């Protein structure tokens, strides 16, 4: 493997922001735990002069080259250079565009950065983020009916990060903590429009997460109940009882990442929206 030590060079060349490349590259690189990519990101490469600098740096530090370029002259020159110095290169969007062209029977418009145009979807995400931040952790419960999704759960079931992730997908998300001994907001009992999802985890997992949280905060005492196994088990039972009573969808997040939890909720939400469409 052509690496130096435990790292390799990864060149990401884009005529736009490079976000697509970074996301794809990091997702793949994460599968190789024993080697670390040294990222060289080149955004907004739209001229031959800008490409000159990129090619010089690639030649100085050879490695994998991934790109999202629409200008054919730039693509041809980049690929030729990589072939000349014997390093791999791949267009991330090229195969996808070819598939679209073959199926739709039409070529692309070739609009650089078209995916970042300020459209209705963009403003929907901004609106969702604003809503979610205002309705985090049980705040402003009078506005719960305006949510697309309401997450409930005991402490450390990842309600807030999951809410923010969903908001970034344009889903207006509120979250409300479930605490034994504290009545839930009456607004939560009568919701009609939002999908209510109750996040659950095993007591063992919750205790582990909570202990790590306390350590990070430097709190060593005074929180025995927070991590006591019986107390946490009672919390979980309380949350399950409420979920069954109000017919909330229950989702086990014990072994799920934030992304996996959000993906499961998005599927539930999408399926629910589809069922509500008129025949």
Curated annotation (Swiss-Prot):
Transmembrane segments: none annotated. ADP binds at residues 153-160. It catalyses: N(tele)-phospho-L-histidyl/L-threonyl-[pyruvate, phosphate dikinase] + ADP = N(tele)-phospho-L-histidyl/O-phospho-L-threonyl-[pyruvate, phosphate dikinase] + AMP + H(+); N(tele)-phospho-L-histidyl/O-phospho-L-threonyl-[pyruvate, phosphate dikinase] + phosphate + H(+) = N(tele)-phospho-L-histidyl/L-threonyl-[pyruvate, phosphate dikinase] + diphosphate. Keywords: Kinase, Nucleotide-binding, Serine/threonine-protein kinase, Transferase. The keyword Ion transport does not apply. InterPro entries: Kinase-pyrophosphorylase, PPDK_reg. Its EC number is 2.7.11.32, 2.7.4.27. It is an enzyme of class 2 (transferase). GO terms for molecular function: ADP binding; ATP binding; phosphotransferase activity, phosphate group as acceptor; protein serine/threonine kinase activity. Pfam families: Kinase-PPPase. The keyword Transferase applies. Bifunctional serine/threonine kinase and phosphorylase involved in the regulation of the pyruvate, phosphate dikinase (PPDK) by catalyzing its phosphorylation/dephosphorylation. Belongs to the pyruvate, phosphate/water dikinase regulatory protein family. PDRP subfamily. This is Putative pyruvate, phosphate dikinase regulatory protein. It comes from Bradyrhizobium sp. (strain BTAi1 / ATCC BAA-1182). The lineage of its organism: Bacteria, Pseudomonadati, Pseudomonadota, Alphaproteobacteria, Hyphomicrobiales.
